[in-house]
């Protein structure tokens, strides 16, 4: 980046004008620090954003998948993984301190970071207290998810163990399409009925794909 005028270099620009003044590629370039032969660091940063669908897509990408990208060695992959974990922990802390419906976008962002990059289907639950603050996020089932593979009694058991008052269901679609299926709707109703028996309310069910999250509640499917 030394070939750029001083006031256009990302680091100098950040120090002079603050991080909000930087484009996504410029922020990423600060993490990457160096580019490749024939490809400057800003070009590499933009190529990564284009490939993975922006910053949210990049942060939701599995570390192993990043290993296939030319120019991302172990050190750079470790730094990106650290940023991802910081984002996860920051969102989890926020959800633990405030009711989830005070920050619905934070819930979606958190689920993107947790589930979007999974190469297989994962069913997870956010267990909430009486104030709808996060008690725990748990991945409970993996594989092809349907009423036969997701056991309501196991979800109920965890809710009771955590003394949860409410729950948000979530699962991913590795296909990249976040549209709920009929099987997803049937599973939701089965879990909703099972949890109601122990006075645990299902507040929502999110379907997560890279770059998008669909809410059952917003669709009127709950």
Swiss-Prot record:
One of its GO terms (molecular function) is metal ion binding. Pfam families: RadC (PF04002), UPF0758_N (PF20582). Residues 100-222 form the MPN domain. Keywords: Hydrolase, Metal-binding, Metalloprotease, Protease, Zinc. InterPro entries: MPN, RadC_JAB, RuvA_2-like, UPF0758, UPF0758_CS, UPF0758_N. A motif (JAMM motif) lies at residues 171-184. PROSITE patterns: MPN, UPF0758. The keyword Protease applies. GO terms for biological process: proteolysis. Zn(2+) binds at residues 171, 173, 184. Belongs to the UPF0758 family. This is UPF0758 protein Mpe_A2695. The lineage of its organism: Bacteria, Pseudomonadati, Pseudomonadota, Betaproteobacteria, Burkholderiales.
């Amino acid at each position: 980046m030394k070939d750029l005028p001083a006031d256009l270099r990302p680091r100098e620009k950040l120090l002079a004008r603050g991080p909000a003044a930087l484009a996504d590629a410029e922020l990423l370039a600060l993490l990457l620090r160096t580019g490749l032969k024939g490809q400057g660091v800003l070009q590499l940063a933009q190529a990564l954003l284009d490939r993975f669908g922006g910053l949210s897509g990049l942060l939701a990408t599995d570390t192993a998948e990043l290993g296939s990208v030319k120019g991302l060695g172990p050190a750079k992959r470790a730094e990106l993984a650290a940023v991802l974990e910081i984002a996860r922990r920051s969102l989890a802390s926020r959800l633990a301190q405030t009711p989830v419906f005070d920050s619905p976008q934070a819930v979606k962002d958190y689920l993107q970071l947790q589930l979007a990059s999974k190469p297989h289907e994962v069913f997870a639950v956010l267990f909430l207290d009486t104030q709808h603050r996060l008690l725990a996020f748990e991945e409970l089932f993996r594989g092809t998810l349907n009423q036969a593979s997701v056991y309501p009694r196991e979800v109920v058991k965890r809710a009771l163990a955590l003394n949860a008052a409410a729950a948000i269901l979530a699962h991913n679609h590795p296909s990249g399409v976040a549209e709920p299926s009929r099987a997803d709707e049937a599973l939701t109703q089965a879990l909703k009925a099972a949890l109601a028996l122990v006075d645990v309310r299902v507040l929502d069910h999110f379907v997560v794909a890279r770059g998008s999250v669909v809410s059952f509640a917003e669709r009127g499917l709950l």
